[in-house]
Amino acid sequence: MTMPLMKPRRKNPVLRTRQMNLPPFARGRTALGMTAAAAEGRFELQVCQRCRAVQYPPRDACHRCLSAKLKWTPQGGAGELLSETVLHHSNDPFYRERLPWRLGLVRMDAGPTVIVHLHGDVPSPLPFAERGHLRNAVDGSRTGPAAAVRVHVGARLDRAGAAVLIGFPPEESEHMADDKMLREMTSDPKFRKVLVTDGKTEVGQALVKALVKAGADIVWVGHAEPWKKLPGLDDITALPQVTLVPLDLTNGRSVTELAGEIGGKVDIVVNNAEVHRGFGIGSRRGTDAARAEMDINYFGLLRLAQEFGPALKGRSADGATHAAAWVNLLSVYALSNYPPHGTFSASKAAAYSLAQCLRAEMRPSGIRVINVFPGPIDDEWNQNLPPPKVTPAALASAIVKALKEGIEDVYPGDVAQEWVARWRDNPKVLERELAAGG
């Protein structure tokens, strides 16, 4: 069984900080289909549309009938562990620094045999000579059939952002998330120090509570106007892990000063600050509202990334609680403009594009950039929209889950799930539907 992770001791500041070495990440275009699914928390393999054979590894033609009609399809993941090996030596710097490392062969119920990283709670299979029989503990005689070692195969993104397969035990254990190998594939908040950029909103306060519940060591909570007493702030500041800090994303000096104070300690940045005004182009004269949205939603992210990004990248291999992730609260409106909230949609589309740049720049350091695309949030700016809407607590829960499972793109809520499905099916049709009112 996995032993619970103990809180690491404070690092000696005199010691050199390790630099990040990524695992091998070269993948062909076809194999990136598995990465695309894993980025959203799904395990998919190619299935031949002619003979229904499941393919592994990814390929351009079916291994059975040579058909090129292969479709990425979700898999259940059940299988039997055939063999395992423990890596005690590697010439690859990433694995060399993390030995020993378990690997295994799993014969999936769907057909193919796959190579997986093995979770520590998966028991070792019997030797081939012993397969199919149990032995008497006294004299070693065969007493009956031995149970196969069952595993559940799931897809995760490794530190380089490439999809890998992991063999999990069929049932979750108490400290399963503390497995050394699994923590290298995820951004679990446990014992990490987190910055939440805006604590005055219901979403921000729900995030703080969810992160504390997930085991965060310290949660710094940004407040642009610390002299104001806003509802809910007293509740979160009463938590021993929480510290309120001055942070105004419209003010470059404010961001720089806070980065100088805590930037070298932050392990996870959660940028939830946003301005949302329900206007289109013609519903309000002037550019003041649109400028305010862009100043926070786009330029705020830019200021934050320029100041906190370098330190985050520099600590991405700094022990068991290394810097791990950057979370951007975007909107499903970023995918296709929603005219009643047109300027807000435009600001989030700009932020989405910038977040893709941030992800590309963070990837060489192994920092995961998580983009969250919720549907309408149940707050004052969506008051007149009918349900379903995403509650702040549900949104916070989805973000913490993404951190724990190493997911890159999250679409919380029924509306977001529906919109992204329609967008993938035909972006132009969705544009026309939204222009016509939905």
Predicted regions: what they are:
Residues T256, E274-R291, G314-T321, P340:
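Conserved mid-core segment of classical short-chain dehydrogenase/reductases
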Residues A305-Q306, Q356:
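A short, exposed helix-loop element centered on a Lys and neighboring polar residues
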